[in-house]
Swiss-Prot record:
It is a single-pass type I membrane protein. Envelope glycoprotein that forms spikes at the surface of virion envelope. Essential for the initial attachment to heparan sulfate moieties of the host cell surface proteoglycans. Involved in fusion of viral and cellular membranes leading to virus entry into the host cell. Following initial binding to its host receptors, membrane fusion is mediated by the fusion machinery composed at least of gB and the heterodimer gH/gL. May be involved in the fusion between the virion envelope and the outer nuclear membrane during virion egress. It holds the Pfam family Glycoprot_B_PH1. The gene is gB. Its main location: virion. InterPro entries: Glycoprot_B_PH1, Glycoprot_B_PH2, Glycoprot_B_PH2_sf, Glycoprotein_B_ecto_C, Herpes_Glycoprot_B. Residues 101-107, 187-195 are annotated as: Involved in fusion and/or binding to host membrane. Belongs to the herpesviridae glycoprotein B family. This is Envelope glycoprotein B. Residues 1-19 form the signal peptide.
């Protein structure tokens, strides 16, 4: 047993460096350091069955290249462009907001009980004003059910107002609005409702995206416009319909808000009008703005192998091959004109790099793979081989042939000279034989090189496949170059990304003991938090800083047990399942398992996962930018002020609040209280329904007109009754006898005393008659008594006696 202080610890190192054999550049050092730090982050890796599925291609065979024609050259690969066309758009719309406010008896009783919001497109003549002066009219007209309704901001008059910028959350979206506050002032009369109107003009400058085949586009706020951004070029702009109309302005002016006086820009612009908004964008040339293909990779030295029906292209930099038909693409320069500038520039740069050893052998050729990728193939030929061919086609017996002539001229002259004698024919045959042997030797070398590359890749795939059976996680991590999680699903592997936890929240426990004295943890327990989370989770420290979401790694406790666990740049030393000390990782020697080959002229072929599209391209491939959409919408919705009360508060100011308060008072009465509450609630609901029905009847146009007529008739009737009452009080005799004044000339009035005697006698006579009627009414039995007596008499067989005499 070696003492602890002399214990030699060796940690396995999977370094891929080659020592002093291959110098490492600064870029490679930075890249290696980035990967190293990524490996030493605390992370949680799950083995979800919903991850990406992969399998190893074990059926790949290396094609037989015997007696095949091999050519070397420069290969450019272009892939389908999945990134949408991104361009600037400007959206215009007017928004009318109508709110209904209830003015309660107190200041706290003011509440908004309802809200309506409508948006409409802006007409073209007003868009011109908005783009030139950033002004608009604060009114709008909306046709609803065949009726044209006019809305004015603040319930006022039509005015020209200024648009001002609004702070946004993202720099890609800029808003200009005319009214930032919602008009929600209550009426002056208590207990009444009032409807307030707000009209807001809005301009939004943002980006839009359109994917191939460019038949529609989506704005950054989520608006979808079913118009091609290049509809002016391909004449696909739709005609005016009920849903969408398009206008093209050949000389439209759009000014910058900060430089409104000097930033005049007159450009061709397209306008699309929908029901809710209008949107415009600058008309551009489609061929100069978008391209269906995009550059992927270039290979300085590639090999083209000719088979019976296809061409095979391979290169040392990639573990994949390309297969195409022999027929090159027709009309490539016209169909893919957008690629020609990049192709010519790239080929010139590649040719310049090998200008000392190779020269172009013909023009560039264009092929298309079965997967839709475009291959640009520029054949190359070694300078020595070209010189040998030129010498072979040049006659040595023709002194007049200039050395600076072209190859075609020398070939023609050599043919003429060869026909002069058999000596030249023998000489030319010798040169041709030497050239054929040289070409065959070069082809054999290229053939062996191609087969070697292919076999090496097949063997590496088989090795990875067998290792994956032992530890798939390590295999996929090595292939991806970053920590991933895997799960074997039969013959395929499910790969998911690991989730980095909050690095500062990870706490490694100092004890490996459990509540059971005989059971101990085989890996240190840890507690941690996820990013943007406050909840603590428990787990165990796994290999290479992975956190396992379980505490099931246990073992029987052993006496004098000693373990070492590495986390980030530190090693934790446990003795008897208790933490003793923390050592730096650098203090522990490494066991380097990499065997360096000190041959600088041999290139290393690494197994790499071919990534056709980067993560950035896949992210941009979606025309919906959901992150920007939701962030901007939430920020804009929260920044609008003016709504001082919510709808929950409005429920406390209506008639139901009385029932709620009444039920709270009678809650302690038990079932009796429930009965009282139900009766009161039914009564209030009944009267509430009656009142609601009356109000709805009044709201109806016919009912409202009838109500106004009824109110007018009642007012007229009241006026007539008041006048009649006044006349009765002023001249009662004249009201009873209208013709009394006409008899003044023929009738002599009586003395006042006599008239008073007559009136007093009439009053006494009326009172005596009234008293007799009251006495008779009092002596008469009540209705209930009469009904009871009638029932009893009929029951005993009695009948009512007739009060009239019968005439016989």
């Amino acid at each position: 047993m070696v003492p602890n202080k002399h214990l030699l610890l060796i940690i396995l190192s999977f370094s891929t460096a080659c020592g002093q054999t291959t110098p490492t550049t600064a870029v490679e050092k930075n890249k290696t350091q980035a990967i190293y730090q990524e490996y030493f982050k605390y992370r949680v890796c799950s083995a979800s069955t919903t991850g990406e599925l992969f399998r190893f291609d074990l059926d790949r065979t290396c094609p037989s290249t015997e007696d095949k024609v091999h050519k070397e050259g420069i290969l450019l690969v272009y892939k389908k462009n999945i990134v949408p066309y991104i361009f600037k758009v400007r959206r215009y719309k007017k928004i009318t907001t109508s709110v209904r406010i209830f003015n309660g008896w107190t200041r706290e009783g003011v509440a908004i009980t309802n809200k309506w919001e409508l948006s409409r497109a802006v007409p073209k003549y007003e868009i011109d004003i908005m783009d030139k002066t950033y002004q608009c009219h604060n009114c709008m007209q909306i046709e609803v059910n065949g009726m044209l309704n006019s809305y004015y901001d603040r319930d006022g008059n039509n005015k020209t107002v200024d648009l001002k910028p609004v702070d946004g959350l993202t720099g890609a979206i800029t808003r200009y609005i005319s009214q930032p506050k919602v008009f929600a002032d209550p009426g002056w009369l208590w207990g009444t409702y009032r409807t307030r109107t707000t009209v807001n003009c809005e301009i939004v400058d943002m980006f839009a995206r359109s994917a191939d085949p460019y038949t529609y586009f989506v704005t950054a706020l989520g608006d979808t416009v079913e118009v091609s951004p290049f509809c002016d070029v391909d004449n696909s702009c739709p005609n005016a319909t009920d849903v969408l109309s398009v206008q093209i302005d050949l000389n439209h002016t759009v000014v910058d808000y900060g430089n409104r006086a000097t930033s005049q820009q007159h450009k061709k612009r397209i306008f699309a009008h929908t029901l809710d908004y209008s949107v415009s964008w600058e008309a551009v040339n489609k061929s100069a703005s978008v391209c269906s293909m995009v550059f992927w990779k270039s290979f300085q030295r590639a090999i083209q192998t000719e088979h019976d029906l296809t061409y095979h292209f391979i290169a040392n930099e990639i573990t994949a091959g390309f297969s195409t038909v022999k027929e090159p693409l027709a009309n490539f320069t016209s169909d893919y004109n957008c690629l020609m500038t990049h192709i010519n520039t790239t080929l010139e740069d590649k040719i310049a790099r090998v200008n000392n050893t190779h020269t172009p052998n013909g023009t560039a050729e264009y092929y298309q793979t079965e997967g839709g990728m475009i291959l640009v193939w520029q054949p190359l030929i070694a300078i020595e081989l070209e010189e040998a061919m030129l010498e072979a086609t040049t006659s040595p017996v023709t002194p007049s042939a200039p050395t600076s002539s072209s190859r075609s001229k020398r070939a023609i002259r050599s043919i003429r000279d060869v026909s002069a004698g058999s000596e030249n024919n023998v000489f030319l045959s010798q040169i041709q034989y030497a050239y054929d042997k040289l070409r065959q030797s070069i082809n054999n070398v290229l053939e062996e090189l191609a087969i070697t590359w292919c076999r090496e890749q097949v063997r590496q795939t088989m090795v990875w496949y067998e290792i994956a059976k032992i530890n798939p996680t390590s295999v996929m991590t090595a292939i991806y170059g970053k920590p991933v999680s895997r799960k074997a699903l039969g013959d395929v592997i499910s790969v998911t990304e690991c989730i980095n936890v909050d690095q500062s929240s990870v706490s490694i426990h100092k004890s490996l003991k459990t509540e059971n004295n005989d059971i101990c943890y085989s890996r240190p327990p840890v507690t941690f938090k996820f990013v943007n989370s406050s909840q603590l989770f428990k787990g165990q420290l796994g290999a290479r800083n992975e956190i396992l979401l379980s505490e099931s790694l246990v073992e029987n406790c052993h006496q004098n047990a000693e373990t070492f666990f590495t986390a980030k740049n530190e090693t934790y030393h446990f003795k008897n399942y208790v933490h003793v000390e923390t050592l730096p990782v650098n203090n522990i020697s490494t066991l380097d398992t990499f065997l360096a080959l000190n041959l600088t002229f041999i290139e290393n072929i690494d197994f790499k996962a071919v990534e056709l599209y980067s993560s950035g391209e896949r992210k941009l491939a979606n025309v919906f930018d959901l992150e920007t959409m939701f962030r901007e919408y939430n920020y804009y919705a929260q920044s609008i002020s003016g709504l001082r009360k919510d709808f929950d508060n409005s429920q406390r100011n209506n008639r139901d609040r009385i029932i709620q308060d009444f039920s709270e008072i009678l809650a302690d009465l038990g079932s009796i209280g429930k009965v009282i509450v139900n009766v009161a609630s039914g009564a209030f609901s009944l009267f509430g329904g009656i009142v609601t029905g009356i109000l709805n009847f009044i709201k109806n146009p016919l009912g409202g007109m009838f109500t106004f007529l009824l109110i007018g008739a009642v007012i007229i009737l009241v006026i007539l009754l008041v006048r009649r009452t006044n006349n009765m009080s002023q001249a009662p005799i004249r009201m009873i006898y209208p013709d009394v004044e006409k008899s003044k000339s023929t009738v002599t009035p009586m003395e006042p005393e006599t008239i008073k005697q007559i009136l007093l006698g009439m009053h006494n006579m009326q009172q005596e008659a009234y008293k007799k009627k009251e006495e008779q009414r009092a002596a008469r039995p009540s209705i209930f008594r009469q009904a009871a007596e009638t029932f009893l008499r009929k029951r005993s067989g009695y009948k009512q006696i007739s009060t009239e005499d019968k005439i016989v």
